[in-house]
């Protein structure tokens, strides 16, 4: 890398990718599938208990930027590795390692760590460490909070072991560690509302949200009870048909724009086309995938936002199989997927008919 290179992705031979702890092997399998399809010579190293995968160039050549991967919360090119910072002057040693790579300005400084119980203690350390680091950066002439500048990532495996990277402006999820800070409104019927709120904020672009979630639009919520997803759609002004044999929250039962049908979500057929199908049913993922495809190819909905509950093993293979089921394997239907922070043993998927106008 040339001195003070602001675009490290051109030279990166290693990427650090973050995921939900316990899903590192699944992210590695997804990386292997991408690298094989793209002809990229690389190999992953998994830190499964930390929720981290390092992807290394196999031949020393720069790696291309990975696409938006389902299991990756965050991804950035590595510029420096500090395996043992000194106890007394961690800031000085870190800046010395970063010196050849620091640009004149940074959009932000993100101190990250494993999303685990042990990582919580590191989080407290990072909050104390951050102001000292930012002050030292300013003293070296690096402007902070500059829009459009690269973002500095520092991954702390512990208080002295750090991996540093620079991410281009606008890349990755717009939150440290890929974790949005969402609060559950008191009026929400269940915590599942946070899942849909995060999905809408990440899987749709701002332009798509404005165009596709307008007051007066229509949606069907399969497996709606107690109504967390229906509630989020109502906050956007959509009219919702909530399909579930279980009860809805009282506030939704009193809402004239919500129609509750006590029916089986797999048997329900809409009387007319709706703008959205949403589904968070606890069911076999392949069965849900076939149901969503049927809705889309039948023209019953323009877009679908749904969860797939994953098996304990071979989860990436399950995702790939479900994608092929939904899209037909030929790009006939659009697909965008992510394991969100509020997902657990599941992923969230946005699928659409091309005429619905989502980006590919």
Swiss-Prot record:
GO biological process: methylation; rRNA processing
Catalytic site: 309
GO molecular function: S-adenosylmethionine-dependent methyltransferase activity
Keyword annotations from UniProtKB, A to Z: Cytoplasm, Methyltransferase, rRNA processing, S-adenosyl-L-methionine, Transferase
Record-listed S-adenosyl-L-methionine binding positions: 192, 225-228, 244, 264, 280
Intrachain S-S bonds: none
Enzyme Commission no: 2.1.1.186
Catalytic activity: cytidine(2498) in 23S rRNA + S-adenosyl-L-methionine = 2'-O-methylcytidine(2498) in 23S rRNA + S-adenosyl-L-homocysteine + H(+)
Main localization category: cytoplasm
Family affiliation: Belongs to the class I-like SAM-binding methyltransferase superfamily. RNA methyltransferase RlmE family. RlmM subfamily.
Subunit-level organization: Monomer.
Protein name, UniProt field: Ribosomal RNA large subunit methyltransferase M
């Amino acid at each position: 890398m040339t001195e003070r290179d602001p675009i490290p992705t051109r030279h990166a031979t290693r990427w650090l990718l973050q995921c939900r702890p316990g899903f590192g092997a699944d992210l590695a399998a997804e990386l292997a599938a991408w690298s094989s399809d793209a002809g990229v010579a690389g190999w992953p190293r998994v830190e499964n208990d930390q929720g981290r995968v390092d992807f290394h160039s196999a031949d020393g050549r720069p790696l291309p930027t990975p696409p938006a991967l389902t299991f990756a919360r965050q991804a950035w090119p590595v510029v420096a590795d500090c395996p043992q910072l000194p106890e007394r002057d961690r800031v000085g040693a870190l800046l010395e390692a970063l010196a050849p790579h620091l640009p004149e300005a940074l959009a932000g400084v993100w101190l990250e760590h494993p999303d685990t119980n042990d990582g919580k203690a590191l989080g407290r350390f990072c909050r104390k460490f951050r102001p000292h680091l930012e002050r030292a950066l300013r003293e070296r002439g690096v402007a902070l909070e500059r829009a459009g500048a690269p973002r500095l990532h520092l991954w702390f495996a512990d208080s002295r072991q750090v991996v540093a990277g620079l991410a281009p402006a606008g890349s990755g999820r717009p939150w440290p560690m890929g974790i949005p800070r969402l609060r559950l409104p008191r009026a929400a019927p269940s915590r599942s509302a946070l899942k849909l709120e995060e999905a809408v904020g990440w899987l749709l672009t701002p332009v798509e949200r404005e165009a596709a979630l307008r007051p007066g639009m229509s949606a069907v919520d399969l497996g709606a009870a107690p109504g967390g997803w229906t509630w989020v759609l109502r906050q956007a002004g959509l009219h919702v048909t909530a399909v579930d044999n279980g009860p809805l929250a009282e506030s939704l039962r009193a809402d004239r724009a919500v129609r509750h049908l006590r029916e089986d979500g797999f048997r329900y057929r809409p009387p007319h086309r709706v703008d959205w199908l949403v589904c968070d049913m606890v069911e076999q993922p392949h069965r849900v995938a076939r149901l969503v495809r049927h809705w889309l190819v039948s023209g019953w909905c323009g877009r679908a936002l749904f969860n797939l509950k994953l098996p304990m093993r071979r989860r990436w293979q399950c995702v790939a199989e479900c994608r092929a089921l939904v899209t037909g394997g030929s790009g006939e239907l659009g697909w965008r997927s992510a394991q969100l922070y509020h997902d657990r043993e599941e992923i969230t998927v946005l699928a659409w008919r091309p005429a619905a106008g989502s980006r590919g």
